[in-house]
Design a protein with these regions (language model features):
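Surface-exposed, charge/polar-rich loops and edge strands
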Residues: 1-167
């Protein structure tokens, strides 16, 4: 993130960053993963498909009806190859979690500043994330409701929005 290898596509609000940073600091943990994506790499897809042929380590459905299935990559050679291929991915993109990412970075920077002999390998130098290739995502609309036109007529409001966006 600090080296611009994790790309953001939306602005964050300082008050939300502050709140998330306080939460991470109080808990001394990032409790919710950031959702990242990358341009698919055929070899990574192949490894995932291979691992998924085995029985999962965890296969649960939460009370809200969402299924979670987890496999573990145990083969050391395969792990090394995955690390090498992921190191070759030019960028990751935040699909969900801009405020969590910003808070994790702020937390890490504060801990780094308070740790004079930091090596760069401390737990605060990373944050929890899930990563999916772009070809396995379905991007759905995320719409906002405008309740106050701030004194503008609907036509004026749409004209203002049209200055920045395609309508």
């Amino acid at each position: 993130y600090e080296k611009d290898l994790i790309k953001k596509h939306e602005y964050t609000r300082k008050d939300k960053e502050d709140d998330r940073t306080r939460h991470v600091t109080e808990q001394n943990a990032n409790a919710e993963p950031v959702f990242l994506t990358y341009r698919a790499v055929p070899y990574i897809d192949h490894v995932v498909d291979t691992v998924r042929k085995d029985a999962p380590d965890y296969d649960i459905v939460t009370p809200d009806g969402i299924g979670h299935t987890v496999w573990t990559v145990r083969d050391e050679v395969m792990i090394g190859e995955l690390v090498a291929f992921f190191n070759g991915v030019p960028a990751l993109y935040i699909a969900d979690g801009h405020h969590r990412t910003a808070a994790a970075i702020r937390y890490g920077q504060a801990r780094r500043a308070a740790t004079p002999n930091a090596t760069g390998d401390e737990p605060f130098e990373s944050f929890m994330a899930v990563v999916f290739p772009h070809n396995q995502l379905k991007i759905m609309d995320y719409n906002r409701v405008v309740k106050d036109l701030n004194g503008l007529s609907p036509e004026q409001f749409l004209a203002k929005v049209g200055e920045k966006f395609d309508i």
